[in-house]
Amino acid sequence: MYAVFIAGGKQHRVEEGEVLRLEKIEVATGESVDFDQVLLVTKGDDVKIGAPYVEGAKVTAEVVSHGRADKVRIIKFRRRKHSMTRQGHRQWYTEVKITGIAG
């Protein structure tokens, strides 16, 4: 059984017990969170496709941790000008464990 849902503007395909990183969610570690924007749910040969979402379907997850991803370095180089701009970025994320798929 797996589902496709939307979180943080991205679509994620998940199965029960899977751990994945999402955009940061303001929920404390150890708490449960529900995602109700489910696009697709499958159970064996039974496939439910939403238009746009599957009614009554939800994905439940437990927050495992919060953190920051590795640094991404941005360099803008201007040729022949002896000029360069450097910048770095570390994105916040929330790690969740999928505990249930209903629908």
UniProtKB/Swiss-Prot annotation:
The keyword Phosphoprotein does not apply. The keyword Ribosomal protein applies. It comes from the Bacteria. InterPro entries: bL21-like, bL21-like_sf, Ribosomal_bL21, Ribosomal_bL21_CS. GO terms for molecular function: rRNA binding; structural constituent of ribosome. Keywords: Ribonucleoprotein, Ribosomal protein, RNA-binding, rRNA-binding. GO terms for biological process: translation. GO terms for cellular component: cytoplasm; ribonucleoprotein complex; ribosome. Belongs to the bacterial ribosomal protein bL21 family. This protein binds to 23S rRNA in the presence of protein L20. Part of the 50S ribosomal subunit. Contacts protein L20. This is Large ribosomal subunit protein bL21. The gene is rplU.
